[in-house]
Amino acid sequence: MTSQDALKKQAAEKAVEYLESGMVVGLGSGSTATFAIHAIARLMKEGKLKDIVGIPSSTPTEEVARSLGIPLVGFEEHAVIDVTIDGADEVDPDLNLIKGGGGALLREKVVAQATKKNIIIVDESKISDKLGTIFALPVEVVPFATASETRFLESLGAKVTVRENQLGKAFKTDNHNRILDADFGPMDDAVKIGMALSQRAGVVEHGLFLGTTALVIVAGADGIREMKAA
């Protein structure tokens, strides 16, 4: 395990301390959230967490949770999630996020908006003063609109890359859409950018998670610290 993975695991272990038996839990996506899923499964097997059900935010997360024996449900059974534990690609001092590095930003945002308390787990390298400083903004678009939305993002000042998979072909999301990675640099007004993107017909969703997070657990060389919403 790398030192970065060890930090992620520490943060995940701290996050699951906020779970209680009987909860509906949102299961995040990506390597950091996977550590939390494993921790949840272990606590269930030990009998320390009972009657937990999960709502996964991506197909890979669903597969991991099923393999570990975590019961899964949909929004048809539970429209409200008690706690979601997820990672992030970047976090600012106000707990606003950039997410979508793994391409699951649409379902992740649906889960986040249905959640009473969102807990984000990151290592120290993901913290910045302004969103866009360390990570480009993922924007999910319908394939038909790839070129037009690329031009629109460029008109806003972003350098845009069409995300590719490991085979060098266009990356497809769980919903069969494309991802444009828009590098704005440090954003002075992330809210304004988010609003502009939300008005575009070809944009399915963007990776700005603004005002959804209650708690960020940060793992660093000096240990664990918590950032809470004001």
Swiss-Prot record:
Catalyzes the reversible conversion of ribose-5-phosphate to ribulose 5-phosphate. It comes from Desulfatibacillum aliphaticivorans. HAMAP family: Rib_5P_isom_A. Belongs to the ribose 5-phosphate isomerase family. The gene is rpiA. It is an enzyme of class 5 (isomerase). Homodimer. Pathway: Carbohydrate degradation; pentose phosphate pathway; D-ribose 5-phosphate from D-ribulose 5-phosphate (non-oxidative stage): step 1/1. NCBIfam families: PRK00702.1 (NF001924), rpiA (TIGR00021). This is Ribose-5-phosphate isomerase A. The keyword Magnesium does not apply. SUPFAM superfamilies: D-ribose-5-phosphate isomerase (RpiA), lid domain (SSF75445), NagB/RpiA/CoA transferase-like (SSF100950). GO terms for biological process: pentose-phosphate shunt, non-oxidative branch. It catalyses: aldehydo-D-ribose 5-phosphate = D-ribulose 5-phosphate.
